[in-house]
Amino acid sequence: MRPNDRKADQVRPIKITRNYTAYAEGSVLVEFGNTKVLCNATVEESVPRWLKGQGRGWVTAEYGMLPRATHSRTRREAANGKQGGRTMEIQRLIARSLRAVVDLQAMGEFMITVDCDVIQADGGTRTASISGASVAMADAFQHLVDSGKLKANPMKGHVAAVSVGLLGDEVLCDLEYVEDSAADTDMNVVMTEEGKMIEIQGTAEGEPFSHEQLMALLESAKVGITEIVAAQKAALAN
């Protein structure tokens, strides 16, 4: 039996709070059960040097964990003088996922940076970051539209992500930490709201998984992402 008696393909309770901080053009606190991530989207009227003069924009992201986001304190990466490999991998994943649903040409020469800071971690921090960042980015773009700097929101749709895994032979969606740490296979799936794939990251930690199990994992992810996109749309409608 899963924690909180969840069904195998059921995501944790989702809460998306917009305008969470006062200064960012888009600010969202996203909660998936006990995992909580603050996603702040900042608009800059500039682009990286290699994009200047091309008339197109850019979306990037940064990711980090507060020291006591986990059960024991984790030393700040700034104190070590550099970011860890896991952090760099995750923030690149977030940025790629966001750019996949943006018409960069329609942005003009603006750049949006989404900072994803994990306040509390209970599994699925990277997938929660992507799902929350999508809403924060939508608000940042709407800020540009409302201020007359863009004619229309250049987002082509929503992007959302979820973790799925195999615990024994059972396919589970949106793994909590206790499930993730025991899973034979752990996979992160990123999709558009239409169900098109953006990224699949999957590893067999224990027994290798079959093609049939892979398809079952992806189907479970699609069910979960459909639910997440509905929560994103509901949050933006309020």
UniProtKB/Swiss-Prot annotation:
Biological-process GO terms, alphabetical: rRNA catabolic process; rRNA processing; tRNA processing
Database matches in Pfam families: RNase_PH, RNase_PH_C
Class in the EC hierarchy, top level: transferase
A molecular-function term among this protein's GO annotations: tRNA nucleotidyltransferase activity
Gene3D superfamilies reported in the protein's UniProt record: GHMP Kinase, N-terminal domain
Positions of phosphate binding: R86, G124, T125, R126
InterPro entries on file: ExoRNase_PH_dom1, ExoRNase_PH_dom2, ExoRNase_PH_dom2_sf, PNPase/RNase_PH_dom_sf, Ribosomal_Su5_D2-typ_SF, RNase_PH, RNase_PH_bac-type, RNase_PH_CS
Top-rank lineage group of the source organism: Bacteria
EC number: 2.7.7.56
Keywords noted in UniProt: Nucleotidyltransferase, RNA-binding, rRNA processing, Transferase, tRNA processing, tRNA-binding
Keyword tRNA-binding appears in the UniProt entry: yes
Catalyzed chemical reaction(s): tRNA(n+1) + phosphate = tRNA(n) + a ribonucleoside 5'-diphosphate
Job description of the protein: Phosphorolytic 3'-5' exoribonuclease that plays an important role in tRNA 3'-end maturation. Removes nucleotide residues following the 3'-CCA terminus of tRNAs; can also add nucleotides to the ends of RNA molecules by using nucleoside diphosphates as substrates, but this may not be physiologically important. Probably plays a role in initiation of 16S rRNA degradation (leading to ribosome degradation) during starvation.
Quaternary state and interactors: Homohexameric ring arranged as a trimer of dimers.
PANTHER family (alphabetical): EXOSOME COMPLEX COMPONENT, EXOSOME COMPLEX COMPONENT RRP41
Family that this chain belongs to: Belongs to the RNase PH family.
Name of protein: Ribonuclease PH
Organism: Vibrio parahaemolyticus serotype O3:K6 (strain RIMD 2210633)
Gene that specifies this protein: rph
